[in-house]
Curated annotation (Swiss-Prot):
Binding locations of L-glutamine: 47-49, 106, 134-135
GO terms of biological process kind: glutamine catabolic process; pyridoxal phosphate biosynthetic process; pyridoxine metabolic process
Protein's organism: Bacillus subtilis (strain 168)
Catalytic reaction annotation: aldehydo-D-ribose 5-phosphate + D-glyceraldehyde 3-phosphate + L-glutamine = pyridoxal 5'-phosphate + L-glutamate + phosphate + 3 H2O + H(+); L-glutamine + H2O = L-glutamate + NH4(+)
Catalytic residues (UniProt): 79, 170, 172
Name assigned to this protein: Pyridoxal 5'-phosphate synthase subunit PdxT
Pathway per the UniProt entry: Cofactor biosynthesis; pyridoxal 5'-phosphate biosynthesis
PANTHER family tied to this protein: PYRIDOXAL 5'-PHOSPHATE SYNTHASE SUBUNIT SNO, PYRIDOXAL 5'-PHOSPHATE SYNTHASE SUBUNIT SNO1-RELATED
GO CC annotation terms, alphabetical: cytosol; glutaminase complex
EC number: 4.3.3.6, 3.5.1.2
Quaternary structure annotation from Swiss-Prot or TrEMBL: In the presence of PdxS, forms a dodecamer of heterodimers. Only shows activity in the heterodimer.
Length: 196
């Protein structure tokens, strides 16, 4: 059985675990770097990106996360997790993991009061998906080899590059688990290749 981890430092961790399990995989809350060895893929959940970065540093996750990526294991960043995954952050010369070849802008849809839901057309899904946006970032620029999966009002809100998936919204806050399912399928594909 596939095991997918959720970085459990902050954010909607339980909801992600519920979504993973609803897709037929096992979910594990990752609170220590050595637990990364137990999972086939990892979700970096929403929350607050600067707080998350501080916790990543405090619990010495930065290098283990980079090693995890270097092994080819899939990673999915949602909301603040997208910022952690991104190669570049607008207005900052200090990216976090720098893995997904995109430029992101923080809080680009406004402050908390500007939380909203929107029906999104997402590549790979037949029907629209309701995206829940909370102080969401968006992707200003998608670099080479990045596939844009969804846009909202001309702004990129989901993208994929190889083993990395990122989105501006919170897919775990709805009972529609199709976006999580896309990630589960990426992890399945990785695991099958790893077994060959």
């Amino acid at each position: 059985m596939l095991t997918i981890g959720v970085l459990g430092l902050q954010g909607a961790v339980r909801e992600h675990i519920h979504a993973i399990e609803a897709c037929g995989a096992a979910g594990l809350v990752v609170k220590r770097p050595e637990q990364l060895n137990e999972v086939d893929g990892l979700i970096l959940p929403g929350g607050e990106s600067t707080t998350m970065r501080r916790l990543i540093d405090t619990y010495q996750f930065m290098e283990p996360l980079r090693e995890f990526a270097a092994q080819g294991k899939p990673m999915f960043g949602t909301c603040a997790g997208l910022i952690i995954l991104a190669k570049e952050i607008a207005g900052s010369d200090n990216p976090h993991l720098g893995l997904l070849n995109v430029v992101v802008e923080r809080n680009s849809f406004g402050r908390q009061v500007d939380s909203f839901e929107a029906d999104l057309t997402i590549k790979g899904l037949d029907e629209p998906f309701t995206g829940v946006f909370i102080r969401a970032p968006h992707i200003l620029e998608a670099g080479e080899n990045v596939e844009v999966l969804s846009e909202h009002n001309g702004r990129i809100v989901a993208a994929k590059q190889g083993q990395f998936l990122g989105c501006s919204f919170h897919p775990e806050l709805t009972e529609d688990h199709r976006v999580t399912q896309l990630f589960v399928e990426m992890v399945e594909e990785y695991k099958q290749k790893a077994l060959v």
